[in-house]
């Protein structure tokens, strides 16, 4: 039973904690927060042992009546691996100041830069490369979504180049500080955006084949991607078939009422998903088209949750718990109730 410490019980951390708890071969030994808020209180209510992420802040939790077990240095020795879910940029400091110092394996999230880790993880593409490694980055929600779709396409034809426009949500639903409220913002205003090179850290052979551009729009529910992928030749039916055969990606039909990110989120609610999480990538079947060997399709990405199962598989890879990535994917999917 792998002992997992979650450093940062926020949007990603609380989801990773719940996902770890669902597995038969791993357990959460503790979660951390930097300050006492409702999430810290909820962690304790859910039965997680709570630790301060910052040494010396334990009294702040005690003053708020939140049961605190100590700080991260009181628990880290017991961990086999740490899943770092701190805000972007903090993970780099934690690698140097905590994980390397205590000789602990750690997974950081996509907000960290690739040069600070040994490799970038995706369950389909880089499980074998990350096997037994010490410091790995689980790539961002957008990169995860693109990697899954490109895997499906690559399984049925050779990819010559990919062009992707990312329509990004302005903020997460719980974030009242970000925006925009009444604007469409090129982010970044330069092309390419960082998303293409990030895909290249997972799939080195695509490094010079993918170019991305990104904009932010006033919505909170999901991102959207519009892909244009030039190939050596395929058909619409072959692409759809490849999508249906690839784990954690599936087709949805606008004709059936799933015609927007709003209705997709409603679908996630209706099937009983916690926090309406959609761990899979939905691709609109009607959007799939092939013109002169170029594939066109549109997909949605639930930014709060699609990376969660990847973190679970990454734990197994780094701790050498399972050699076969497909077996790990199947274990994770079954435990979490992922559609396929």
From Swiss-Prot:
Pathway: Carbohydrate degradation; glycolysis; pyruvate from D-glyceraldehyde 3-phosphate: step 1/5. Transmembrane segments: none annotated. It comes from the Archaea. D-glyceraldehyde 3-phosphate binds at residues 140-142, 195-196. Its main location: cytoplasm. NAD(+) binds at residues 11-12, 111, 169, 303. Its EC number is 1.2.1.59. Keywords: Cytoplasm, Glycolysis, NAD, NADP, Oxidoreductase. The keyword Transport does not apply. The active site is at residue 141. It is found in: Cytoplasm. Homotetramer. NCBIfam families: GAPDH-II_archae, PRK04207.1. Belongs to the glyceraldehyde-3-phosphate dehydrogenase family. This is Glyceraldehyde-3-phosphate dehydrogenase.
């Amino acid at each position: 039973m792998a002992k997992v410490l979650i450093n940062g019980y926020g949007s990603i951390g609380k989801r990773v904690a719940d996902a770890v708890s669902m597995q038969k071969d791993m357990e959460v030994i503790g979660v951390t927060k930097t300050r006492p808020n409702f999430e810290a209180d909820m962690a304790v209510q859910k039965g997680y042992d709570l630790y301060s992420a910052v040494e010396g802040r334990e009294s702040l939790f005690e003053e708020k009546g939140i049961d605190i077990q100590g700080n991260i240095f009181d628990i880290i020795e017991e961990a086999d691996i740490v899943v770092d879910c701190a805000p972007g940029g903090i993970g780099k400091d934690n690698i140097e100041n905590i994980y390397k110092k205590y000789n602990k394996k750690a997974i950081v999230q996509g907000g960290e830069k690739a040069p600070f880790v040994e490799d970038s993880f995706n369950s389909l593409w880089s499980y074998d490369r990350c096997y037994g490694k010490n410091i790995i980055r689980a790539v961002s929600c957008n990169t995860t979504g693109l990697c899954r779709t490109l895997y499906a396409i690559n399984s049925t034809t050779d990819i010559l180049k990919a062009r992707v426009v990312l329509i990004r949500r302005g903020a997460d639903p719980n974030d009242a500080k970000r925006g925009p409220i009444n604007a469409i913002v090129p982010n970044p205003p330069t092309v390419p955006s960082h998303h293409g090179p990030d895909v290249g850290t997972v799939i080195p052979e695509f490094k010079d084949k993918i170019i991305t551009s990104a904009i932010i729009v006033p919505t909170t529910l999901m991102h959207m991607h519009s892909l244009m992928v030039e190939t050596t030749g395929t058909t619409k039916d072959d692409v759809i078939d490849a999508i249906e055969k690839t784990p954690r990606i599936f087709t949805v039909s606008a004709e059936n009422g799933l015609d927007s990110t709003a209705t997709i989120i409603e679908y996630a609610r209706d099937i009983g998903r916690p926090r309406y999480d959609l761990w899979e990538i939905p691709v609109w079947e009607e959007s799939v088209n092939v013109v002169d060997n170029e594939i066109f399709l549109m997909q949605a990405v639930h930014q709060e949750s699609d990376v969660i199962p990847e973190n679970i598989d990454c734990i197994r890879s780094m701790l050498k718990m399972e050699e076969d990535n497909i077996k790990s994917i199947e274990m994770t999917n079954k435990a979490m109730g992922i559609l396929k």
